[in-house]
Amino acid sequence: FSDFNDQLLDINATPPSITSFYAYNEKYGFNQDKSSLVGVSLNGIYDTRDNQNNPYKGRYAYLSYKMNPEFLGSEKSSSTLWLVYRDYIDIKKDHHDIIGFWGWGNFTITGDLPYMLLPSSGYDQFAKSARPYPQGRFRGQNMIYGETEYRKHLYGSKKNPDLLGMVAFFNVTTASSVENNINLFKYINKGYGLGIRYNISKKARTNLG
């Protein structure tokens, strides 16, 4: 990250307008104009899903331990642990009612991370966590996220039996902040919503919506 434009920051105002970005980087000694985090990781995957785009059943687990030493280019040495788990249940065995569970945890194990590279909502692999909040709404040294999703078949044609469906979801996010004395689960932020899905590829199970 580089060329930050912190529009709400005004240290010359009376009183000064200090943002979380500025205060955090000042406290931990990070550059206010750019951030770098370079490292190596150890990864493991377990995947029994019958489809990656729209699974009817199966489980997925992912683990990544990342080490970010200064000698590789990181501003400060640190290490992080990223855990992901997904599970899918076909309630009636006809693919018309699916319940999906998704959870992940992103933890700072050692050292400190630049503000923009802290565990944050919406920065998962597909940028889908913490719907309907904007990306990066929640941020902290450690973060845990959980979501339940119900997928319902609505209409099908002879050409595409899974043409139209709906989805309802509910999620929770919690983050820690050492400098503000906030531990995990002190605050739990909730999100929920409904949506319509239109199937554009029966074979690949690709949906829009």
What label would you give each PLM region?
Residues 141, 146, 156-163, 176-180, ...:
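Extended hydrophobic-aromatic, low-complexity segments
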Residues 40, 51-158:
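C-terminal outer-membrane beta-barrel translocator/porin domains of Gram-negative envelope proteins
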Residues 1, 42-44, 61-63, 101-103, ...:
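Membrane-embedded beta-strand positions of outer-membrane beta-barrel proteins
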